[in-house]
């Protein structure tokens, strides 16, 4: 059986060698972090869980590798043995590569200030206050930067962040994804239409300077090489690659043998009523429904719909939920895409 461990000191030695700040947050009992074990008295294995990541330590344990706390998305093994066990227990997980960044960076304040000052005309940087927090929570691209705190009040008390503002709206956000006593873990997100303008570098540099002013360390972990390059521009150094097993809660609710009688009626073209009025095309291929569109970077996308109800579907590796009506496709419950054909 899997138990939540309150006395985190019992597993501190198991996590010796871990450099991820989320593990540090868990061992310090910060935010809504959890430590899970299968032996409360003498744990030889442990899972540290915070935000949407689970980190394993100690002896490989099948119960822990099979356990999925609510909200978990990424499982990070500490050894090949743990990785093999996760693959056995989570066969639908998608293995991805993440990039660790060295701790203890020696930042050049002058360089950071130059990046802040290079903010393009028409933009300004604002610290995230209550109003900006609310806006971030309402925008899918920025929600993850602030949502892992228990409340807005907790974020404003414990966290920190800055946003590049254009026409009164946030377009790039650097924020504390999580916190630990000695610092924060940085999350950076920029709207697709606002990328390659130096906005991410500017808001990240401003956040790092804020941390340095208050004696906090701004920890960084990268999901892709673009993030690594940005980190290096800011003064960090790349450390190493590591595996992460990406789960999707959607798979737990997918209907395995759906009634496809009405699926042909869902096919056709739909117009997205916001942004660039993008056209979505829904079609059947090999008995499954697919969504076809061209993203904002001009790249064709072909995504499979996964049935979760008679007329409801989800997309893997995202929170999007789609419902069909006779004359529309409804995205996430409120964006109505009118059927054109």
How should these model regions be labeled?
Residues 1-20, 107-152:
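Short amphipathic alpha-helix that is part of the acyltransferase structural core
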Residues 27-40, 50, 153-162, 184:
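A short helix-loop-beta-strand connector motif used in the catalytic cores of GNAT acetyltransferases and
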Residues 62-67, 186, 196-210, 229, ...:
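Conserved acetyl-CoA-binding loop-helix of GNAT-fold acetyltransferases
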Residues 71-80, 211-223:
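Conserved GNAT acetyl-CoA-binding A-motif
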Residues 151-191:
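A conserved beta-strand-loop-helix scaffold within acyl/acetyltransferase catalytic domains
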Residues 251-341:
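Peripheral terminal and inter-domain segments
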